[in-house]
């Protein structure tokens, strides 16, 4: 038996190659093989294996029992036969298969019916073939049309082969080549039991598991549709028959019928169940209603009948922020925007035309920056981000503060009269905007801003500083220059209505016209070293609006430093709401709104640097100052300088409408003292500082508003502009560091830093002046100013910050002298305007010093103002020189403005004290 078993394991059969079998035997190393090799030499082993006649090898090995259908597993042969018959379009039945096997494999014993059925069932379970009423079909001929070589190397098939060949030999033992039938019978009796048992277990399990699979497979088979349960049942029946036969009756087939019946029932049941399940699944797939009932659109015929809640839910999903209230608010805001845009277009059409290209450039550049900032206070609207022309309306939406946002646009209507841009306070617009939530009221306003800002903010906020940036050769420089120019142009537009002071602060209509005319007439001038100035003037028209914003910003400094004072500044400014006092009114509006509006406007005006000026109060401005101390000094200082001039001037302007934008005489007086003090620190004389500041302011006014001292404005603008240009531009690059250094240096060398800072502030404030000078004198000496600025920038950049500050201070002293002369020459440059300018200078200085000289340790308003002036000058020059210092770069500027202009004291002493407050505020913010 051992031998027989070993032979069976080897599965040698008569037709097989004996040499191959011997090699197999050597590889398998069965007991028989081991004995064979042991007894006979290796050379003799092949012979013994071939003949199987060796005494030790052949006689006991009954080779006949190993009646494999073929060397290839029967299942594979059946697959090949079925595939061939399918290709020949012959129906494949068990009888046909038997015939085919007999014909195609004449040397191979034909399997019995039972083995054939069993093998076919196994193949069906294995999904290699599928039964149909027309016969068996190969499932995937490409996959299962396996060549004998593949089958040989397929252990799986060898395993099947082990089972199937044994079955075949059991059921139909072939007369072995040299095998006695007895051995075959013995093996038949013995092996079939085990084999059949294994087959039975296998088959039942496989059948149960695969019956549904078989059905599916057959259904899936492309050749035939779903096999009816009966069809499918037939192969299972065969399978179960064979399975049961072998499993229950291995030795004899006496009980095959019973077992077959059982297996039939079982198989039929399984197939039916599986088929039903499949059908149920299919039905389930298509039985569902579409669209599902839970879908909101229940009535397709009447879609208008969508439930309100469903519709709202859909809308919410589409746009969570979209609500009826928001939509209404957005619609109202858009209407207001359109109106404001129309007003702005009317007022600043020429300004828009002249500054459109520059504005677009600056808009793009500063829009990105301001957007990043405005993202923090998008709702507040980043006036600095948008051009101020756009900002007035944009700010209204951005800030939604009737006073802050709207006053700028609504309160100040820029009219281009002749060459002058006159800022008219549009009380109605202002009032119409007043109902709007203050910009600092973010809760309701934020949504509005979200809806509004997308449209107005870019044009407003971003246009404002963008215009500045685009105008300056570099975005930042442009931003600084444009801020200064915007503030100046605002002051100019205000000065048209108010006075040289207001004009210089906001930009007189002349300056606006000059900005337009110069921008339009002399692009090269506008692109002079401080091309931003030109653009600022071009933007000056925009700044006319911006000027109103600047006036608001002017008030903003006061409000920022002393949030209490916005009302005073506003009250001072409010009396003069006529176009002349519009700057005052703008300042007035900006004062009340400056708490928040000034945050935004001043930040925007100063440099968009205080893009984050979210706080409606001076604290935020102080924070902004702190945030953008260097930059704020750089950026805000120019704007703030302008703004302080404007804010301080508006009072004087109100008192003497031709004067400063929003300073008012009281503001002028306060500023005069503040400037005197600040400039005493700078110039060591309140009068020199105030006068210098007034010069600066007035020269600005004269620049913007030659009415007062047009004579010396141009000549002085040229000289002081050159100085200012050189100063602002020279420190532009060094300004950031210098402004930062300025605080320590201010602390260490207040006088030194003060002259330099004052120079810078004058450059910054006078940069506005010098920007205005550039605007006014750029026509005469745009190239000269540009060259001077470039040379001075280079020199000052090379020279130390303190040296540059000293140089700038000297130049500012000269400028202040010029401005004094201009102030004296200017008819509007009365004491009130001088006070306004001094106050403006003091505010600017105090704003700058409050931010920059926070650590200076100087509490005197003069020192603060001088430091602020220095800071402003540095900031302005840095802005001109270094675009990186542009408002977008620093947010400290607005803080300076806020503090400086937050003091709306009516008298110089009060304003000087307020610069101290500004300094303190800046210290707190810093």
UniProtKB/Swiss-Prot annotation:
**Alphabetized GO MF terms:** RNA polymerase II transcription regulatory region sequence-specific DNA binding
**Compositional bias (Basic and acidic residues):** 18-32, 379-394, 473-495, 632-658, 684-693, 785-799
Biological process terms in GO annotation: embryo development ending in birth or egg hatching; maternal placenta development; regulation of transcription by RNA polymerase II
Per the record, its GO cellular-component terms are: cytoplasm; nucleus
User: Residue spans with biased composition (Polar residues)?
Assistant: 518-529, 746-772, 847-884, 914-926
> Where are the residues of the annotated region Disordered?
1-32, 338-394, 452-529, 632-693, 724-803, 825-926
* Lineage top rank: taxon: Eukaryota
The record's Pfam families line, in alphabetical order, gives: Stork_head
List where Basic residues composition bias occurs: 353-378, 463-472
InterPro entries attached to this UniProt entry: Storkhead-box_winged-helix, STOX1/2
Q: Kindly provide the name given to this protein in its UniProt entry.
A: Storkhead-box protein 2
Q: Which organism is it from?
A: Macaca fascicularis
Question: What lineage, starting at the top, does this entry show?
Answer: Eukaryota, Metazoa, Chordata, Craniata, Vertebrata
